[in-house]
Amino acid sequence: MNQTTHAVRGESAIAPPNSPISIIGAGIAGAWQALLLAKAGHSVTLYERDNADMREGTTHWGGGMLAPWCEAEVSEPIIMRLGLRALDLWRKELPDTPFNGSLVIAHPRDRADFERFARMTEGHTRLDAAGIAEIEPSLEGRFREGLFYPAEGHVEPRRVLPELHKRIIAAGGSIKFDCEVQPDDCDGLVIDCRGIWARDDATPLRGVKGEMILIETDEVQLSRPIRLMHPRWPLYVIPRADNRFMLGATSIENESSGVSVRSALELLGAAYAVHPAFAEARILDLGSGLRPAFSDNLPKIAISRPANGRNTIAVNGLYRHGFLLAPALAELTLNYVQRGALDNEVMQCK
């Protein structure tokens, strides 16, 4: 899809090259903002309230799926538009990003949901049992049919975020961890990527809890995320390095911390349903994060240009699409900063 059909060209640059830009929040949204702006020649400082491990942030607990076709089942068209552009940016900036596709499977009792998923999405090929076994030998004989989305990808959040931070520094930017700041504390143009921490300035922002479990086993080998149809929400098993797998993810409309017993049972049950060998896997970690979401579950870039005050850009509301959308939203911000271009589906001017 052509992103430029939604753009309105502005009159001039908002921040000239080499001008200071302060970005608050070093999660996936802020990291991509910092990377593209630093590579464009701006003097970027990225502030993060957490330490470099960033266990407090939503990014730490993310799935890292780059799956615009699968997400189209329950998402607005803008998610597909931005997601397709983001895939190109992932390939450009991090060429080693794996694009092995996604596989959707279901048990016979969930066949109606499986067929609905197929109707609601594009970009897939139907596989029979032999086709599933060909691309995922560990699943041989486990499922009779699946939907294969060959152009989708995935990243490992706890590895890719430090890599983005390294590239920001290599591009001339700086990162200050353990440094909690407010927009009024910063120099130059301010880009607010605090996620749920910005709720007081970004109403009606809410937190949607997503829970995950990290397990380890060498009894199962997978090359791509596996989505298992489920009556309440799609559950998935995502392969990670060193024989590890991420199980996710719930989507719960409350902001409590931790993982509930019910959610843990559903996530572990999904893994067992994909392959019984997961029953002997070791549980390494479990936790939850709060996805920042507006009432329509769509991302927004809010631009504030008061007559006498600090210019601020707030990027928020990525909901469950943080890794998918962050690069495209960063590019929209860059286009606005460099030439005043506005995307009228995403950007709001105050």
For the regions a language model picked out, list residue spans one by one.
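Helical element adjacent to the flavin cofactor pocket in flavoenzyme catalytic cores
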Residues: 147-182, 193
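Short hydrophobic core segments
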Residues: 24, 186-196, 330
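Dinucleotide-binding Rossmann-like beta1-alpha1 core, especially the glycine-rich loop
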Residues: 63-135
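Active-site substrate-recognition segment that forms the wall
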Residues: 35-39, 66, 96-98, 196-310
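Glycine-rich FAD pyrophosphate-binding loop
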Residues: 39-58
